[in-house]
């Protein structure tokens, strides 16, 4: 079945950089950022899910639920469109039933262009758009997340489902995918690899968020399978996102005990970078958030990025967290925006750090921030009332 490409393309906000491919800021070395123009600033590939959220009430005691549309790969596209004004698209599975209608409406409302491989629902069993169940926790009570991904349409996606030469031939500056989609099935991982090859052939930057999810990988062969799949994909990327735990669990990199280290100490992460670039010489930039969890609603928050032998660390802020889900995707979006806009490594990391923090102050998985709020926080702004 041929994919459906639909939805308006919004005009992008003017980037800071000028025309012509350029290195993404001082210290980011050989990461050549395509100039503005073309059809899309970013194309994401991944599954889209419905998250049912009872707030701070444990799920088993809930009487009401908020519905969020989410997905690690989709969230990045949604954040870049809604907050940063970039032209983005999501290549994903769509099911022709009312849940699909809800998801489609939310995708378009965020300003993201949908590119669908459509599936017909049989009225009883599926295929389905996956459901994620969560409660936010509170104080000393941690958040809880579990899934129903039975007969998930996104897991049926396979090479050949999308016309990558046509999509990238219209000029896409950045391609993004992640470990959550890669974990769904053998065919979903193969589809990412197919898209990455097409992206490179067209001159797009390729990024991968490791986003290791043990519960999902357990259904697809566990860590050994993750190492095999994610290792193949990491070999094809320019920008790798993930902390030291992701590097160990998803890629099998040896490293110090994550539990024993401070969440704010970048040394464990930076100490593993030499291994990363030795094993994956194509990787030019690696970045992650750093956090120390004091309680469910109070975190110390920082971030670190490495590019071509240079590392930068964001300041540490005390962050009041409303809904933790989506903060990492908010970080990824801020980083990509900064790099596409011609920012240097430190400025791009600051934008990522600021936007990721802001996303955790809203309900749901995607941004409600404005670019002005992100820039203000990145510069060291405060929560004083704006009049």
What kind of region is each of these model predictions?
Residues 58-78:
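Short catalytic helix/loop segments, enriched in acidic residues and glycine
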Residues 2-15, 20-60:
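Positively charged, low-complexity intrinsically disordered leader regions
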Residues 296, 312-381, 385-387:
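Conserved post-catalytic alpha-helical subdomain immediately downstream of the catalytic base
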Residues 190-203, 228-236:
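Catalytic-core regions built around general acid/base machinery
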Residues 90, 206-208, 240:
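Hydrophobic faces of well-ordered beta-strands that scaffold small-molecule active sites
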Residues 87-179, 374-387:
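Conserved N-terminal subdomain of the carbohydrate kinase-like
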Residues 68, 76-87, 109, 338-341:
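Alpha-helix C-terminal capping segments
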Residues 215-309:
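Conserved phosphate/ATP/ADP-binding segment of small-molecule kinases
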């Amino acid at each position: 079945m041929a994919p459906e490409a639909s939805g308006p393309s919004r005009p992008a906000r003017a980037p800071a950089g000028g025309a012509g491919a350029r290195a993404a800021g001082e210290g980011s070395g050989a990461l050549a950022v395509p100039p503005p123009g073309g059809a899309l600033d970013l194309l994401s590939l991944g599954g889209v899910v419905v998250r049912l959220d009872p707030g701070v009430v444990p799920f088993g005691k809930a009487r009401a639920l908020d519905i969020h549309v989410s997905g690690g790969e989709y969230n990045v596209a949604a954040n870049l469109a809604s907050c940063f004004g970039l032209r983005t698209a999501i290549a994903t599975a769509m099911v022709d039933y009312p849940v699909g209608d809800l998801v489609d409406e939310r995708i378009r409302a965020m300003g993201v262009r949908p590119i669908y491989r459509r599936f017909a629902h049989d009225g009883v069993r599926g295929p389905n758009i996956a459901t994620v169940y969560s409660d936010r926790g509170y104080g000393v009570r941690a958040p809880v997340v579990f899934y129903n991904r039975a007969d998930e349409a996104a897991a049926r996606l396979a090479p050949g489902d999308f016309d990558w030469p046509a999509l990238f031939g219209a000029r896409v500056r950045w391609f993004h995918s992640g470990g959550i989609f890669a974990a769904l099935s053998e065919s979903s991982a193969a589809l990412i690899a197919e898209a990455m090859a097409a992206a490179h052939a067209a001159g797009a930057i390729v990024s991968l968020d490791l986003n290791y999810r043990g519960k999902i990988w357990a259904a697809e062969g566990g860590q050994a399978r993750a190492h095999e799949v994610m290792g193949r994909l990491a070999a094809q990327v320019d920008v790798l996102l993930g902390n030291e735990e992701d590097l160990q669990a998803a890629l099998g990199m040896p490293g110090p005990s994550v539990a024993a280290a401070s969440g704010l100490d970048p040394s464990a992460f930076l100490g593993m970078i030499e291994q990363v670039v030795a094993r994956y010489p194509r990787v030019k930039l690696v970045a992650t958030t750093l956090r120390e969890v004091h309680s469910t609603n109070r975190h110390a928050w920082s971030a670190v990025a490495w590019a071509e032998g240079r590392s930068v660390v964001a300041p540490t802020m005390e962050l009041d967290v409303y809904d933790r889900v989506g903060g990492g995707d908010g970080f990824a979006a801020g980083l990509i925006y900064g790099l596409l806009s011609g920012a240097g490594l430190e400025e791009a990391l600051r934008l990522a750090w600021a936007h990721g923090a802001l996303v955790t102050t809203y309900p749901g998985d995607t941004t409600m921030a404005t670019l002005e709020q992100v820039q203000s926080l990145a510069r060291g702004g405060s929560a004083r009332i704006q009049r």
